[in-house]
Amino acid sequence: MTSAILLVSKNRRKQLNDQVFQQAIALAFCSISVLVNTGIANQTVLAQPPKQQKCDIYAYVITKEPQGLNVRSGASPTHRILGKIATNETVKIVAASGKWVKITDITGDFKGTGWVYLPMLSISSRGYGTDGVNIYSNANQKSQKIGKVPPSTSVKLLGCQGEWAQVEYQGIKGWLASEDQCGAALTSCS
């Protein structure tokens, strides 16, 4: 009798273990499904390109590539190359999306509109005959003045917003007003 009880008990334990195992598998699949679906949803959101910022500034090409700067059909290095722009050519920036800017009004051989990698462009300060131009903390002249750029000095271009250029000069990151910008490499714009 005891061996019959033990056998029933072992069988019952096996059934319970099987049920627990099946429930654990079902729970694991549900958890994986939730994680995968949430991950896919998050990836879809993350895969969207950065929002475009409208701009209206001029800059010049500073690439060291002998063939010039690639102009692309979209805001990434995977987009088709439409043409090239030589170093020191002036371009008009009409939009920005992350580290890419949409350009037009190009002074060189390439005519049309396209996208270029922002770190390959620069601007200079105006202010000829003054002690320099102000760098502002935000894209408006009522914001705090956080630094100065000497006249006719090349600065690193970080971005743009309307007619304002986001720049970096000697570690100071801020904004240059449109009247303080020079988008031509070989002139002081005075």
Predicted regions and their residues:
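SH3-family beta-barrel domains
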Residues: A26-S73, K84-T87, I93-S97, D105-T107, ...
